[in-house]
Amino acid sequence: MRRNTIDIITLGCSKNLVDSEKLMRQLEANGYKVTHDSPNPQGEIAVINTCGFIGDAKEESINMILEFCEAKEEGRLKKLYVMGCLSERYLKELEVEIPQVDKFYGKFNWNELLADLGKEFHDEMAIERTLTTPKHYAYLKISEGCDRSCAYCAIPIITGKHTSRPMEEIIDEVKLLVSQGVKEFQIIAQELTYYGVDLYKSQKLPELIEKIAQVPGVEWIRLHYAYPTHFPEDLFRVMRENDNVCKYMDIALQHISDNMLTRMRRNVSKSETYELIEKFRREVPGIHLRTTLMVGFPGETEEDFEELKEFVQKARFDRMGAFAYSEEEGTYAAENYEDSIPQEVKQVRLDELMALQQEISADLSHNKIGQEFKVIIDRKEGEYYIGRTQFDSPEVDPEVLIKADGKRLFSGRFYQVRITNADDFDLFGEII
């Protein structure tokens, strides 16, 4: 056990990661040595930043807390603190059921941890972070919460109403991160397209992205977690006119059947969804679309699922994730629908859908053979340098593998690469 050392463990999404990075900076400013997701944590204090989105995530968070409780009981840890979405939602229950934790914090009051440690929260450092990502890219959170009322989703229950960050504050953070070597920004929010409505009374995402694109040193901007209803179409122009805005959009569509979209309370129709996809590809030639789909939502019939498969085949998404519905207490679906589809049926549908997408992804990847792309290098693994094109977000999308062959490439630098081969997941290339 190392004195004056704190281990931070982050579970869940990139939005949680940003919170952990801000906490780390505050702790370091108060004289602590801080590690993040260490495979061998040895600090005298641990802070677990939890996820409470779906059942599997909650289970992972509970298991991690119990693992550190055991370390505390064995004398390998002095203090254990828990923050994030799980404790935001289940604070009272957790305090009763896991008394070994010294204190639980919600998602928005983790700054109180500093006071409980007898330290100071530095307001003047509110936008500063200790990056846990490679130093050339960062996640940039532009808002919290969500005003949508999707039937299956617990996020609004956990994080509350949509709250946009002031544009000036975001730009200041971008400039600070650029000064520290960041070139690539993953723009994240629970719901990107609503940005600005609460602060400025209108959608301001296109204006914000254009301002970020104009900051010297910003090489790539990539957009995550958009919503299809009332999509701000001026964003198409921003993507066309600014080379550093990646031709990439992560937009969760969930389903295509009008029956399912209505039951999910998505406020969008099948025809509107197809129209939006066509508009993306018409207005931003070459754009790569990532989406997320759901199977097994209450009331999903075989006909609904067949429509979904047909949609995947027709839309040919460049990137796609999918998951099986799990009932979340407090949501509209949990209170109004019976979770009647057997788990084995959900799994069969999920496997079938992902098998379809794997064929499409492999086909699209093989179509890139012979083409040339600008690639940023993330790291070296064994005999290969690992990089990404503008169409690939870290952690979730395919990578480009470049054989070292005695060459020395540098993490965070861009290279022109010709694609020479592809497998079901990744591309292989050579430096031009």
PLM region spans:
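Glycine-centered loop/turn positions within well-structured domains
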Residues: N111, R148, T193, D258-N259, ...
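Terminal RNA-binding accessory module
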Residues: A333-I432
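Active-site proximal loops enriched in glycine and acidic residues that flank catalytic Cys/His/Asp
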Residues: A189, Y225, L253-H255, T291-V295, ...
